[in-house]
Amino acid sequence: MMHQIYSCSDENIEVFTTVIPSKVSSPARRRAKSSQHLLTKNVVIESDLYTHQPLELLPHRGDRRDPGDRRRFGRLQTARPPTAHPAKASARPVGISEPKTSNLCGNRAYGKSLIPPVPRISVKTSASASLEATAMGTEKGAVLMRGSRHLKKMTEEYPALPQGAEASLPLTGSASCGVPGILRKMWTRHKKKSEYVGATNSAFEAD
């Protein structure tokens, strides 16, 4: 006699077949046989209750299942009308291609919206070139005004800086962000040195 034991895990269901001789002589073997039969029933019930996969996917993984299940599944597949598959296949590309084209159009429109309008107009007309030049001039003027403000702020914070160091200050960014650490160290050293030299000079001046 053949008994099948089903073991269920999170991934698949495995089937183990055990062959037991039909002639059972001792009552111990009968008890073992009945307990094994109950065990197989319990395992099958648990596998039906606690399976995590959908029932449609189980026949695809049935490499170790009975051939009867395979035959049944094959009959179900052949019983379906063959005209349903081409209709689905022909309907799917239309549904998929429409969002793709809309996405492409949306991306193109989004990309066009990101491009500034001034270079596009400057290619077509010469009047817009003057507009672009004035826009660039205003931007440069704004940057220069910001740079002069930062330079003024730096001169107020570091009054003992030499003229070359003031000229080499960055136009944008604050003193802590835009200035590198090496230049800050050099400026602080020069400041301390100038204060020290001034103190010694004032000591040797005549009263």
UniProtKB/Swiss-Prot annotation:
Chain intervals with Basic and acidic residues compositional bias: 58-71
Alphabetized, the UniProt keywords read: Cell membrane, Membrane, Neurogenesis, Nucleus
User: What subcellular compartments does it reside in?
Assistant: Cell membrane; Nucleus
* InterPro entries listed in its UniProt record: Vexin, Vexin_dom
Look up the domain of life of the source: Eukaryota
Q: Which GO terms are recorded in the biological process aspect for this UniProt protein?
A: neurogenesis; neuron differentiation
Q: Where is this region: Disordered?
A: 56-100
Q: Which Pfam families match?
A: Vexin
Cellular component GO terms, alphabetical:
nucleus; plasma membrane
Cell membrane as a keyword of this entry, yes or no, is yes
Which family is this sequence assigned to? Belongs to the vexin family.
* Protein purpose: Required for neurogenesis in the neural plate and retina. Strongly cooperates with neural bHLH factors to promote neurogenesis.
What protein is this chain from?
Vexin
The gene designation is VXN
